[in-house]
Amino acid sequence: MVNLPFAGHTNPTLGLARVLTDMGHRVTYIHSPAWREAVENTGAHFVPYDDYPLFPRPFQDRMRCWRAAYRTVLRIGAGYDCLLYEMLFVSGKALADRLGIVPIRIFSTFALNEHVLEDFGRNGGLYLTSIFRFPRLRALISAPMSRRYGWRFRELEAEIVRNSPALNITYTPRSFQVYAGEFPQSRYAFVGASIDGCRHEPCELPEGGGPLVYISLGTELNKSERFFRRCVEAFGGTGVRVVMAIGNSV
């Protein structure tokens, strides 16, 4: 297994690593050094990225991790049966093909195709979706990455959509998947949410019997105090129980 150092893309995969090791499989998980404890708690063998700092600066976490993860898999991956990679590691399919092993892609949220990415680029926030909104920007970014990582296609969207592995595991129920009918059951397993339990800290839900709503902005764009205040105002006095993940910056 290989992943990039982002909590929202990593946490859903830890339960899978645990299940595979419990079944007797030898699982090696390549990740940032900061994720050693979380990975080793699953029973998997942890391998840190080659030539990567223990405490990287934010820019390194976002950029250098791609090359470090790729080089580490390339160095040790040939002896394995398959490569499980989270979808953000776009080079996973091309890398598995280069190593001659089976690729398996994991979607930590919903599955992607050209229609999903088109909607994503049109409706999502500019910071994360501009690459899918502006073709020239996408081409400018895609070309050097395609050459460096041996993509089948020169363009990012084509590599994601058209160079798809035979098995894709999606942590979203099919009933929640947008354009669900465009994802064949023979290639996409919609397994639902992966929640590995509260193993490290006590986890107590709000008291009461009302509906439970979980609110999160993820790990990247989560510094909106205004958003969380509006959620409190919206649900206040409704009888709804609310759990908010606000990180350490609000």
List the predicted regions and their residue ranges:
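A short, aliphatic-rich alpha-helical micro-motif
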Residues: G77, R162, P206-G208
